[in-house]
């Protein structure tokens, strides 16, 4: 009988901390549904106390996820734990994940607490979390730089208080695999079967996956990871790499296995990339575009003669279908519906109808509509806030010797408003003109153009990060078009709509508190 290592996915919480990876509630719901389809044991849906948006997303995910455990992060503070408990209340299976720093440097300079005070706080946090849920996880932040004697002391104390999972994070990605393995082995010998040991490894030295795997070999039975290795700084351990390493190297891992349906790995990777706008590098293990590509003639010849000559796993094992059907303008609604289900989306009939209309419009302009085109069509709609402003027309004059100018028409409250303006470049002219029409000034922090597919008729996705109020966080806007300028204008208008939606949500939250 297989010994299961639980997969704890934190794409929606830690993964979202990747620069530019911010997601709205509907996007998070789509990813959560796909993670459940993938077979993830625990979905860390967010940090409930962080913002009204995080709280709302966790609550809505808790309402739709049925099989996976839904988890919220919480500092070892009563207000955080209360928010987490309330956010995950609707979940069929729920967990609160509370944490406090345990390294000398963190306790002294960040917490400004003595070790015995930290233990007391941790125990009280676990006890309070138990009043909301049965399943409580406790993390020793910066465990990689903590003293072993203190780690054992605080871990045994929180287990006594009711923690069922103990997470050992390598918060700054400092440990080497043999060090991580030795630490987990010693802790496992101390804890034995009183709690599950989990690891959460960061990739600052490129060792997150190796550290996670060595931990599993030494007693860890939960691994915290993200799709495509997303995460702040250099990212987190990549789920797909951990799972496929365990699956592929049975000579090392023996009866150890996961509950992951590996055929959903590639669809999940593509969905996350489409929603976040962050593509895995081409040579990324397992899910990169070159992972199953063989350019060398010798390699190609070998693979054609026998697949296992140069491939240790099959593309089909991760759900990469090299013979996937490509849709076009003659494709019907039934084929389109089947395709979006295969791509991991869960849409209502009304949403399918709207998506099909956009697909037909795109198919009239493109000979072939790829899977990535369809992903972008749908995720672009999911990413969109309610359309207070809507782009209707765009005309640009980008002559080589003159000053770039743009004429923009925007619809607001049923009326069309047109204005024209100049800028330091075409994009600047478009954005300044939109600012003048709406009366809201934005500051562009980031601008990305993503070629969704290949060829002259490739679909372009533009992602912008804009600050409209220095006292509020930047907002993300997405735009999609064969014309990059139109996609840019749509993205900027989308960011403005997101800003308005965020203001309305904050206002509603304040009204509820009053």
From Swiss-Prot:
<dbReference type="InterPro" id="IPR013785">
    <property type="entry name" value="Aldolase_TIM"/>
</dbReference>
<dbReference type="InterPro" id="IPR036230">
    <property type="entry name" value="LeuA_allosteric_dom_sf"/>
</dbReference>
<dbReference type="GO" id="GO:0003985">
    <property type="term" value="F:acetyl-CoA C-acetyltransferase activity"/>
</dbReference>
<keyword id="KW-0100">Branched-chain amino acid biosynthesis</keyword>
<comment type="subunit">
    <text>Homodimer.</text>
</comment>
<keyword id="KW-0963">Cytoplasm</keyword>
<keyword id="KW-0479">Metal-binding</keyword>
<feature type="binding site">
    <location>
        <position position="14"/>
    </location>
    <ligand>
        <name>Mn(2+)</name>
    </ligand>
</feature>
<comment type="pathway">
    <text>Amino-acid biosynthesis; L-leucine biosynthesis; L-leucine from 3-methyl-2-oxobutanoate: step 1/4.</text>
</comment>
<dbReference type="Pfam" id="PF08502">
    <property type="entry name" value="LeuA_dimer"/>
</dbReference>
<feature type="region of interest" description="Regulatory domain">
    <location>
        <begin position="390"/>
        <end position="514"/>
    </location>
</feature>
<dbReference type="Pfam" id="PF00682">
    <property type="entry name" value="HMGL-like"/>
</dbReference>
<dbReference type="GO" id="GO:0030145">
    <property type="term" value="F:manganese ion binding"/>
</dbReference>
<comment type="similarity">
    <text>Belongs to the alpha-IPM synthase/homocitrate synthase family. LeuA type 1 subfamily.</text>
</comment>
<feature type="domain" description="Pyruvate carboxyltransferase">
    <location>
        <begin position="5"/>
        <end position="266"/>
    </location>
</feature>
<dbReference type="GO" id="GO:0005737">
    <property type="term" value="C:cytoplasm"/>
</dbReference>
<dbReference type="InterPro" id="IPR054691">
    <property type="entry name" value="LeuA/HCS_post-cat"/>
</dbReference>
<feature type="binding site">
    <location>
        <position position="202"/>
    </location>
    <ligand>
        <name>Mn(2+)</name>
    </ligand>
</feature>
<feature type="binding site">
    <location>
        <position position="200"/>
    </location>
    <ligand>
        <name>Mn(2+)</name>
    </ligand>
</feature>
<dbReference type="InterPro" id="IPR005671">
    <property type="entry name" value="LeuA_bact_synth"/>
</dbReference>
<dbReference type="InterPro" id="IPR000891">
    <property type="entry name" value="PYR_CT"/>
</dbReference>
<comment type="function">
    <text>Catalyzes the condensation of the acetyl group of acetyl-CoA with 3-methyl-2-oxobutanoate (2-ketoisovalerate) to form 3-carboxy-3-hydroxy-4-methylpentanoate (2-isopropylmalate).</text>
</comment>
<dbReference type="InterPro" id="IPR013709">
    <property type="entry name" value="2-isopropylmalate_synth_dimer"/>
</dbReference>
<dbReference type="InterPro" id="IPR002034">
    <property type="entry name" value="AIPM/Hcit_synth_CS"/>
</dbReference>
<keyword id="KW-0028">Amino-acid biosynthesis</keyword>
<feature type="binding site">
    <location>
        <position position="236"/>
    </location>
    <ligand>
        <name>Mn(2+)</name>
    </ligand>
</feature>
<dbReference type="Pfam" id="PF22617">
    <property type="entry name" value="HCS_D2"/>
</dbReference>
<dbReference type="GO" id="GO:0003852">
    <property type="term" value="F:2-isopropylmalate synthase activity"/>
</dbReference>
<keyword id="KW-0808">Transferase</keyword>
<keyword id="KW-0432">Leucine biosynthesis</keyword>
<dbReference type="GO" id="GO:0009098">
    <property type="term" value="P:L-leucine biosynthetic process"/>
</dbReference>
<dbReference type="InterPro" id="IPR050073">
    <property type="entry name" value="2-IPM_HCS-like"/>
</dbReference>
<protein>
    <recommendedName>
        <fullName>2-isopropylmalate synthase</fullName>
        <ecNumber>2.3.3.13</ecNumber>
    </recommendedName>
</protein>
<keyword id="KW-0464">Manganese</keyword>
